């Protein structure tokens, strides 16, 4: 009796197991005296979907090639299920890779392409037929089993490539920007398909992309890379809401950054009920004029780096477009920064407003659109006031990101 393909090989990600499958320790890679990977350390759990995210040239594809065995590290170690992979060639590792170019065999049918790896392993014919049938059903291509790759759409070809990669039940599947050649609508569809397949099969996925939306929508964790180093490793919510530095803040999603001067730092202290508060800092936003006098002091939650902050220091306030609120400049109820609308983009459920503050700084606000609310009828060059709720911002220290 053959094992069903639908039986997870590993514990699915939803079980949140803590068992480590892949361990990268002190990895370095050097080409011609240029270090392209610098002290990479990462533990990846069984059944996890983790994304290596970063701009072109950050080292993410090089790291994937080291894991796959296509290249060897200059230093450090790679452990897969506790076994050292150093020196082991790619074809000897329980790892499969899906590339941007799917490399399907044009002279073979869809079913023959998917079965190819099983035939190389001399799996019995009856078992091959069963597993191919199950795999094609899982990727919803059973009705195309006898088609040639050139007769398929881009999304269908990609699903064939994934089916061929996972039918061998690898412990680890590596995906190098497999969605980048697809159009936007199909890319969104395939994001859902990939996550569904990963969850049902329970195979650990390491996904490489430069697309922040792909990373945020599919990943259990994201490892943000720049210049051969990890900048931050965390869940999509952690990466988006609490970026570790200015690079991550600017690279992930759309960002408004405001300079502010620290006016007071207040340490943790017990409240009236004896509970310890997180403390707070007071800042004055440096960006622009406000109505009726100087910029007010804002009372903010105490950032993680508050022990290193002194009165007079400059910090960065991170606010996403959806955090900002727009008011009439004559509104007396809300304080805020003055500016004018220089562009307005209707996107169905939201209205995006590009605003130039009085000092020339350009920011973006995104609000849910309400056609019955006259306050949404912003005209170009119309004066507005921009504000936010204290506590919605994320505070980062001043740094040089170049």
From Swiss-Prot:
| E.C. number | 7.6.2.11
GO-annotated molecular function: ABC-type putrescine transporter activity; ATP binding; ATP hydrolysis activity
Which Gene3D superfamilies is this protein grouped with?
2.40.50.100, P-loop containing nucleotide triphosphate hydrolases (3.40.50.300)
Where does the ABC transporter domain lie?
22-252
InterPro entries for the chain: AAA+_ATPase (IPR003593), ABC_SmlMolc_Importer (IPR050093), ABC_transporter-like_ATP-bd (IPR003439), ABC_transporter-like_CS (IPR017871), Mo/tungstate-bd_C_term_dom (IPR008995), P-loop_NTPase (IPR027417), PotA-like (IPR005893), PotA_ATP-bd (IPR017879)
Entry keywords, A to Z: ATP-binding, Cell inner membrane, Cell membrane, Membrane, Nucleotide-binding, Translocase, Transport
State its location(s).
Cell inner membrane
Q: Which Pfam families match?
A: ABC_tran (PF00005), TOBE_2 (PF08402)
Residues that coordinate or bind ATP:
54-61
What reaction does this enzyme carry out catalytically? ATP + H2O + polyamine-[polyamine-binding protein]Side 1 = ADP + phosphate + polyamineSide 2 + [polyamine-binding protein]Side 1
Q: What is the recorded membrane topology of this protein? A: Peripheral membrane protein
Supply the CDD domains for this chain.
ABC_PotA_N (cd03300)
Please explain the role this protein plays, according to its UniProt record: Part of the ABC transporter complex PotABCD involved in spermidine/putrescine import. Responsible for energy coupling to the transport system.
Question: What's the family?
Answer: Belongs to the ABC transporter superfamily. Spermidine/putrescine importer (TC 3.A.1.11.1) family.
Record text on subunit structure and interactions: The complex is composed of two ATP-binding proteins (PotA), two transmembrane proteins (PotB and PotC) and a solute-binding protein (PotD).
Q: What NCBIfam families does the database record attribute to this sequence? A: potA (TIGR01187), PRK09452.1 (NF006987)
| PANTHER family assigned to the protein according to its UniProt record, in alphabetical order | SPERMIDINE/PUTRESCINE IMPORT ATP-BINDING PROTEIN POTA, SPERMIDINE_PUTRESCINE IMPORT ATP-BINDING PROTEIN POTA
- The protein here is known as Spermidine/putrescine import ATP-binding protein PotA
